Amino acid sequence: MAIIGIGTDIVEIERIREQRDRLGDKLAKRVLTLDELAIYAAVNMPERYLAKRFAAKEAAAKALGTGIGRGVSFQHIHISNDDNGAPLVNFTDGAALRLAQLGGCKGHISIADEKHYAIATVILES
């Protein structure tokens, strides 16, 4: 195993809350997959959930070396949780293609949040 990419992102939760208040669910629909949107609609603090997913997907895109754009969209990166609640990152479409181009086989993710911020780090391995 070798590390082939690493990315980190931090998001101010209040900024997400303000966008949600101003634009409704427009950002959520752009960032979240259908499965993630279903969870977002059911959680108690949707702006916190969205901030964590936004940070996670930005971190994953940075680890891929592209950022969002250049063939990788938010919809190509899916964040879920295993049976113990640990986060998982999965790649499809353009993100999966980029991972393969890098010789990657797996992504590891850590997500954390506090009162004001959400942060995520993604490590890609070959």
Curated annotation (Swiss-Prot):
Location in or out of the cell: Cytoplasm
GO cellular component, one term: cytoplasm
Chain positions recorded as Mg(2+) binding sites: D9, E58
UniProt keyword ATP-binding present: no
Gene Ontology molecular function terms on file: holo-[acyl-carrier-protein] synthase activity; magnesium ion binding
Membrane-spanning ranges: none
Keywords: Cytoplasm, Fatty acid biosynthesis, Fatty acid metabolism, Lipid biosynthesis, Lipid metabolism, Magnesium, Metal-binding, Transferase
Any one GO biological process: fatty acid biosynthetic process
Cofactor(s) this protein cannot do without: Mg(2+)
Enzyme Commission code(s) on record: 2.7.8.7
SUPFAM superfamilies, alphabetized: 4'-phosphopantetheinyl transferase
Enzyme class: transferase
Presence of keyword Cytoplasm: yes
Catalytic activity: apo-[ACP] + CoA = holo-[ACP] + adenosine 3',5'-bisphosphate + H(+)
Family: Belongs to the P-Pant transferase superfamily. AcpS family.
Function: Transfers the 4'-phosphopantetheine moiety from coenzyme A to a Ser of acyl-carrier-protein.
Protein name: Holo-[acyl-carrier-protein] synthase
Upper classification of the organism: Bacteria, Pseudomonadati, Pseudomonadota, Gammaproteobacteria, Alteromonadales
